[in-house]
Amino acid sequence: MAFPTVSYSRDTPAGYPGMIATTEPHHIISMVVSGTSGNIPFGIGVLFDTAEDTVKLPTAIGKFAGVAVVDRTLPFANGEVYKPYDQISVMKNGSIWVTALVAVAQGDPVYMTPTGGFTNVANAAANPLIENAEWASVTSGVNQLARLRLGVTK
């Protein structure tokens, strides 16, 4: 009887935006998408809205709430987004897959763009620094999947 050839990579396989990246400790909170927010794609940074326990899709600089975590229990018709008034899971601390808008390196600082994307490019007028966050993987180009680590103690 022949045995199939099996091999395993030592690297974690790539995930998808909004997927929890590792089993390291993480903290996820439940919020509600503001009625005035646009649809929030998985893996996008969100801002606190003015009403208690609500978040919104960024349209300008605001107070960073966390990263939208994938929820596979949402109706298929929603697509891969949270809609206004949906309950949303927001990662505050831990490791999550996101799309890096530019090439990043491990340990680089993380900045959020006004549309909720993530970069390592500083721009005080448009890309605020996310405190205690760092890139946990390396990319070689634009719009590539990367691990973002929130709540880093240095």
Tell what function each PLM region has.
Residues 1-154:
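Surface-exposed, low-hydrophobicity beta-strand/loop segments enriched in small/polar/acidic residues
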